[in-house]
Design a protein with these regions (language model features):
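Outer-membrane beta-barrel signature, preferentially recognizing the C-terminal barrel domain
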Residues: 410-416, 459, 488-537, 544, ...
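Face-selective signature of the C-terminal outer-membrane beta-barrel domain
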Residues: 240-246, 250-262, 289-448, 473, ...
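Short acidic/polar hinge/loop motifs at secondary-structure boundaries
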Residues: 71, 77, 105-132
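N-terminal periplasmic accessory domains that precede
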Residues: 71-74, 114-115, 130, 142-172
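Surface-exposed extracellular loop regions of Gram-negative outer-membrane beta-barrel proteins
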Residues: 150-169, 207-215, 225-226, 236-241, 444-446, 476-521, 542-562, 676-690, ...
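Short, acidic, small-residue-rich periplasmic hinge/interaction motif at the N-terminus
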Residues: 23-64, 84-86, 92-96, 131-133
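Outer membrane beta-barrel strand-and-loop segments of large Gram-negative receptors
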Residues: 227, 359-361, 405-410, 510-512, ...
Length: 745
């Protein structure tokens, strides 16, 4: 058989396999096939990026940079996601979003996304999904949408089908660098009707030499100068296990369990200088500062799925999810000689804060196929959520004796019971695809103070949350879509906690128990185009919110800077996101992720307003060098970001990676280097209050270099293979996906 016929046969086989997979509901989420045909291997690889009108999927395992990067590094590449210089994450232009892991909400990840993703190696993740219009099936919380992290499960051949092949795959990975060291392991496999997956990791990060300096000038001429250099240590560990068993041809049961621990030790010795105004000739003081944080999270779930027809288009899923997330924070402040200090009271202190969030979730989802082109989803959900906070304040004597200060201590409990029901209809009519849904959530909330000042209260409220989307396939490889959603944000325990943190003698911070649920509206228009060498996705969005929760600061009568939260902001946001994936040459790929937005923020209650443009640009060039060396070079550039009381300056840094597979592609070696434009990443912030102006400079030692080794093992063939210097199959599969018009297949 000549070469031309071999290529033709390979293409036909790939198309047949993809067509077959689209008409069959599999337990695995993969439609990739790898088979041998008389020494000819046919490989169809998933696209690096799959764009839909209401969801974007970034295939992390297909990106060569994942071998040497963290999940946070990969998020900088993901469309609709922005990561700033302080590792703060926004999704769809909002810092309020929910993090799911393998399709299930994870409170630990949602509470600490930056810290966790910065410690988590990217090779533990299969896909990152950005669901900008989650629809009625998902919880209404999270104004930016849902960030779903799909963990890597190297599925063996036959998993989820009738072929009950036994086997396993796995890998062990280790990273050593100037700032972090980590080790991780993954194993997954199948024994008869049982499939299993387990992973674990440990990361230790050390960052020394971070500096914070600011000057605060008040209307009366009082001036405060502050300088702090700190060292930070962050240990992080995580383990997950999942099991699935096929009870019969129409039903299966699965269970998952995960444990995550996160710690942070922060040490510094700030120096504070006061002068002018009420401070006269002035004075200065220094103090030793220590902060210890420990966070542990456990989550477990069990799911039962039952199909009601052999086509598996009608099915019921019953689910239970449990999660708990306790956090302990200890703050120590010990002052130097304070004999010359006047005007403010200084004394050694210790504060201990314990919080715990616990959730029980029960859910039932039913999917019914009305016809070959229409589908109806409906279901119900109940969440029992309890948040406890115990904050204690201790005065420390000269001999280090600790005495509880009950007047400044507080203990309270916040409970939420949420009952939800939804219905969602999806249809596909030729080139048109549509989805309409509605969700209603009723919340019963109660706050009870066990100790400290505060009034117990009960309240209940309901939220009707509509969603809709419409898509049209203009031509093969080209579509356009529009979607609308209403999202809500319930204030968490951090915002509600009315405990007053007095660890800083010149400032206090506290939460607000009177916060209301935030309601945000978002309208997006999406355009997708791609051919065998070029992909373009553009999203135009407009969002508005009239009761956004903002953190704001003001000076009180005692000249203390108060920082708290309130539903005080009205926001309007117009945005454009552009993603380009261009196969310039056979071995050269260029990627661009550009986000541009205009924000208008106003607060009638505070009398403040601010507005301005900001942009974030990621440009990435991937090149295959001789000897199959994979080389990447890229840059992240962000402009000034505006908030209600000021702005944060832009930033820029560069990175490069070099990867090589050896030992019959069982061992991957990857080298990564990242550096800002200066020796440290410089971040400047300006805050303007009614009676003060503050300018802050933060310098972060961001420069990193690391080496990663990954050993792959197993007794089955890998189902997923990296496409070498060719993304033709990526776009072929994506072109088939776009013709579904948004209808799941």
């Amino acid at each position: 058989m000549n070469k031309k016929n071999m290529i033709l046969l390979s293409s036909l086989l790939v198309c047949s396999l993809e067509s077959f997979a689209q008409n069959k509901v599999e337990a695995t989420d993969s439609i990739l096939k790898d088979m041998d045909l008389d020494a000819v291997t046919v490989v169809a690889s998933k696209p690096l990026v799959k764009m839909e009108t209401d969801k974007m999927t970034y295939n992390v395992e297909q990106d060569a940079d994942a071998k040497a990067s963290t999940v946070l590094d990969m998020l900088r590449k993901v469309p609709m996601v922005t990561v700033d210089g302080q590792d703060n994450i926004t999704v769809n232009g909002s810092s309020s979003f929910k993090v799911y892991v393998d399709g299930k909400p994870n409170p630990m990840f949602s509470a600490n996304p930056s810290q966790i993703f910065k410690a988590m190696p990217a090779n533990m993740v299969k896909n990152i999904e950005v669901i900008t219009n989650p629809g009625a099936k998902y919880d209404a919380e999270g104004t930016g949408g849902v960030l779903n992290i799909v963990l890597n499960k190297q599925t063996v051949n036959g998993a989820g089908g009738n072929d009950l092949s036994n086997g396993y795959n796995g890998n062990i990975s280790a990273t050593a660098g100037n700032q972090a060291q980590s080790i991780s392991a993954l194993i997954s496999g199948q024994q008869g009707k049982l499939t299993y997956s387990a992973n674990g990791m440990y990361n230790y990060q050390k960052m020394n030499g971070t500096t914070i300096s600011f000057d605060r000038t008040q209307k009366d001429g009082s001036l405060m100068n502050y300088y702090q250099e700190s060292d930070m240590k962050q240990p992080f560990s995580m383990g997950n296990i999942s099991l699935s068993y096929e009870l019969d041809s129409l039903s299966n049961i699965s269970a998952t369990a995960g444990l995550t621990t996160f710690g942070q030790k922060l040490n510094g010795h700030p120096l504070t200088q006061m002068s002018g105004g009420i401070y006269g000739k002035g004075f200065e003081y220094g103090n030793e500062m220590k902060q210890n944080l420990d966070n542990t999270s456990f989550n477990g779930s069990i799911d039962y799925q039952r199909f009601f027809n052999k086509e598996r288009t009608n099915y019921l899923i019953l689910s239970y999810l449990f999660s708990t997330n306790p956090t302990h924070i200890d703050n120590y402040t010990f002052y130097d000689d304070i004999s010359q200090v006047t005007g403010i009271q200084l004394h050694d202190l210790l504060s201990k804060s314990k919080t715990r969030g616990t959730e029980h979730t029960f859910q039932a989802d039913f999917t019914h196929s009305l016809s070959e082109t229409q589908r109806l989803n409906f279901g119900a959900k109940y969440i029992a959520r309890t948040n406890k906070s115990d904050s204690r304040y201790y005065d420390v004597a000269a001999d280090k004796t600790e005495t509880l200060n009950p007047a400044n201590s507080m203990e309270y409990k916040n409970t939420q019971n949420i009952l939800a029901a939804y219905a969602e209809w999806k249809g596909n009519f030729g080139k048109w695809g549509t989805m309409m849904g509605t969700r209603y959530e009723q919340t019963w909330e109660k706050v009870k103070f066990e100790q400290g000042k505060g009034e117990d209260f009960n309240k209940q409220y309901g939220n009707l949350v509509p969603s809709a989307s419409l898509s049209y396939n203009i031509a093969p490889g080209m579509n356009i879509g529009m979607n609308y959603q209403l999202r809500i944000t319930r204030p968490g325990i951090t915002y509600l906690n009315s405990y007053v943190d007095r660890s800083n003698p010149t400032a206090i911070s506290y939460g607000n128990t009177d916060l209301d649920v935030v309601k945000s509206h978002q309208l997006n228009m999406v355009f997708n185009y791609y051919n065998q060498r070029f992909m373009l996705s553009t999203t135009l969005g407009y969002g508005f919110c009239d009761n956004k929760i903002e953190q704001y600061s003001f000076l009180d009568a005692d000249n203390l800077l108060n920082t708290t939260y309130g539903n005080v902001s009205k926001t309007r946001n117009a945005s454009m996101n552009v993603f380009i994936n261009w196969l310039m040459f056979k071995k050269t790929r260029l990627m661009l992720n550009e986000s541009l937005s205009y924000n208008d923020l106003r607060s009638d209650a505070l009398g403040w307003k601010n507005n301005g443009w900001n942009s974030s640009t990621m440009i990435n060039l991937q090149q295959t060098l001789p000897w199959e060396l994979q080389w990447t070079v890229g840059s992240i550039i962000q402009t000034k970001q505006h908030n209600l009381q000021g702005y944060q300056s832009g930033m820029a840094f560069f990175y490069t990676t070099l990867s090589k597979s050896i030992v019959k592609e069982k061992l991957d070696l990857s080298l990564m280097f990242l550096t800002p434009t200066d020796d440290k990443l410089n971040i400047k912030q300006k805050t303007v209050g009614s009676d003060y102006v503050q300018n802050m400079t933060i310098k972060v030692p961001l420069r990193q270099i690391s080496l990663t080794l990954t050993w792959k093992f197993g007794n089955t063939k890998k189902q997923f293979q990296q496409a070498k210097s060719n993304i033709k199959n990526d776009f072929q599969e994506e072109q088939q996906g776009i013709q579904t018009g948004g209808m799941e297949k």
